Design a protein with these regions (language model features):
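Conserved TIR/SEFIR loop-to-helix hotspot centered on a Trp-containing motif
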Residues: 109
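Glycine-rich phosphate-binding loop at the start of an alpha helix
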Residues: 112
């Protein structure tokens, strides 16, 4: 079984915020698969589907972002998921332009509290992850107020595009492997100004 976890905060007030783009990505995957993510299980909302030949559990932890690891640990244990091979975590990245994604097979949390909670709970950095860029158009307007505020109307088209891109990338990871997905999507989304050293870490 593959476990796809989107990170975010529960509650309607956070529903369409940059910090919840992981939840939105899981919802988009579910929509494309024709399923709902509405079963409460292991401190998360979950839904089952198939992608290719794989059984997939979609999950949105309800523990709030900073305690996401509690739910992910429970899901991994209860479904006997290999956390290093069969878990994919999707979350927001304030340092990436809105509309871009980055896929990594492993690494630190880079300061993201939700990802750090998962690393702590699983006791490994060997966790596949996909970061979705949510940076504001004006860098001076970033920070907590921005990521916990609603997306602006001018951003919605790009949000829609990146959610479709995330769903495509998940399909590639599951069906063709993470190396193929990294090669295809990281290069496709690479900003011209990004230096080569940084690109090799992704």
């Amino acid at each position: 079984m593959k476990l796809i976890v989107g990170l975010g905060n529960p509650g309607i007030e956070y529903q369409f915020t940059p910090h919840n783009i992981g939840f939105l990505a899981v919802d988009r995957i579910a929509e494309q698969c024709g399923v709902m993510v509405d079963n409460r299980h292991a401190k998360a909302l979950t839904g089952r589907t198939r992608i290719g030949n794989e059984e997939v559990l979609l999950a949105k932890p309800e523990t709030y972002m900073n305690h996401s690891g509690m739910s992910v640990r429970d899901l991994v244990d209860k479904h006997e998921v290999n956390a290093e091979k069969d878990l994919i975590v999707i979350y927001d990245e304030l340092d990436l332009p809105l509309g871009m994604i980055r896929i990594r097979a492993r690494g630190s949390s880079a300061g993201h509290n939700g990802m750090q909670s998962i690393i702590n709970a699983l006791q490994t950095e060997e966790v596949q992850r996909m970061r979705l860029g949510v940076a504001p158009d004006d860098p001076a307007k970033g920070g907590a107020r921005y990521i916990l505020g609603q997306f602006r109307k001018s951003q919605l088209a790009r949000v829609d595009e990146v959610l479709d891109l995330a769903a495509q990338a998940v399909n590639v990871i599951i069906n063709e492997g993470i190396a193929t997905a990294m090669n295809r999507f990281n290069r496709k989304n690479k900003p011209e100004e990004e230096d080569k050293d940084n690109a090799t870490k992704l």
